[in-house]
Amino acid sequence: MGQSLQEGRKQGRLLPAPSAHFLKHAHLASPSEVGGEPEIGSLCASHVLHMSPLYSVNLQVSPGSLTFHSLSLRSTSTRLQPQSTYIVGPLC
């Protein structure tokens, strides 16, 4: 990730990533957007990562980690929530 990529995003030439895969209300702020090191307040507490006619996946974001929060089945209005938190992977 170079400076040219950040400049391209600011000028509207490139879609922001990774937020291009998120719903419009779930934006992952990069350190450059919040002026330095990311803080808890710079990220949404929870949001929908993927939504289809059948299900939606909800994740929680904290600095340095992305955790699975719940899975909602839209056809039956069932919400599956794990007893414990699963770490999906570190944020780049």
Swiss-Prot record:
Taxonomic superkingdom: Eukaryota
Name of the protein: Putative uncharacterized protein encoded by LINC00208
